[in-house]
């Protein structure tokens, strides 16, 4: 998606350790116009798959997921990283490791909001090592829900996440695919 690539080039920053900082439009401050276009792109890609719900992880996946949900006219469910007083029982839970934060988190979704009647689209902000998406796939499996596709905002194609997700047989679509972040230069793969 050319618009997203332009935002990444103009407002993204490469940090040591192949970290891409995109807090100017995705991870801290959100650009609603960009989110709307991303939502439309995900909807266009997955519109014929019978999606009944979109599932993501708090917090940076929520904005793109909501705009995709709006475009597809389906609800959005986000997995919580921390349990609250209102989210204690009847949960589907998976443990995911965050390479950016260097720690594992339990993510949970209420059984009330995900069932075997659902066909879901997983949406996440980044694909690097694939652990977040795999955790959401595990939750979907626990619920008996069908996963029709995985939508990624920014994919670091030089890491193993895509390869791991491809092994599941579930279609993966990334709006921006980064080939390299070496020498603080952002290089993209061609669009899918």
Curated annotation (Swiss-Prot):
SUPFAM superfamilies: PRTase-like. One of its GO terms (cellular component) is cytoplasm. CDD domains: PRTases_typeI (cd06223). InterPro entries: PRibTrfase_dom, PRTase-like, Pur/Pyrimidine_PRTase, Xanthine_PRibTrfase. Keywords: Cytoplasm, Glycosyltransferase, Purine salvage, Transferase. GO terms for molecular function: xanthine phosphoribosyltransferase activity. Gene3D superfamilies: 3.40.50.2020. It catalyses: XMP + diphosphate = xanthine + 5-phospho-alpha-D-ribose 1-diphosphate. One of its GO terms (biological process) is xanthine metabolic process. Xanthine binds at residues 20, 27, 156. Coiled coil: none annotated. Its EC number is 2.4.2.22. It holds the Pfam family Pribosyltran. 5-phospho-alpha-D-ribose 1-diphosphate binds at residues 128-132. Transmembrane segments: none annotated. Pathway: Purine metabolism; XMP biosynthesis via salvage pathway; XMP from xanthine: step 1/1. It is found in: Cytoplasm. Its main location: cytoplasm. Homodimer. Converts the preformed base xanthine, a product of nucleic acid breakdown, to xanthosine 5'-monophosphate (XMP), so it can be reused for RNA or DNA synthesis. Belongs to the purine/pyrimidine phosphoribosyltransferase family. Xpt subfamily. This is Xanthine phosphoribosyltransferase. It comes from Listeria innocua serovar 6a (strain ATCC BAA-680 / CLIP 11262). The lineage of its organism: Bacteria, Bacillati, Bacillota, Bacilli, Bacillales. The gene is xpt.
């Amino acid at each position: 998606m050319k618009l997203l690539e332009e935002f990444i080039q103009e407002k993204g920053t490469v940090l040591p350790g192949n970290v891409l900082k995109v807090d100017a439009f995705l991870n801290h401050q959100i650009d609603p116009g960009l989110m709307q276009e991303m939502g439309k792109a995900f909807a266009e890609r997955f519109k014929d798959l019978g999606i009944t719900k979109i599932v993501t992880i708090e917090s940076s996946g929520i904005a793109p997921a909501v705009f995709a949900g709006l475009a597809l006219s389906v609800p959005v469910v986000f997995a919580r990283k921390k349990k609250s007083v209102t989210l204690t029982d009847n949960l589907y839970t998976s443990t995911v490791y965050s390479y950016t934060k260097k720690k594992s988190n339990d993510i949970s979704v209420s059984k009330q909001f995900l069932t075997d009647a659902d066909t879901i689209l997983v949406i996440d902000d980044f694909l690097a090592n694939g652990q977040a998406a795999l955790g959401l796939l595990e939750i979907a499996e626990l619920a008996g829900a069908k996963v029709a596709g995985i939508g990624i905002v920014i994919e670091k194609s030089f890491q193993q996440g895509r390869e791991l997700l491809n092994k599941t047989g579930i279609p993966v679509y990334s709006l921006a695919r980064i080939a390299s972040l070496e020498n603080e230069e952002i290089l993209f793969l061609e669009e899918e």
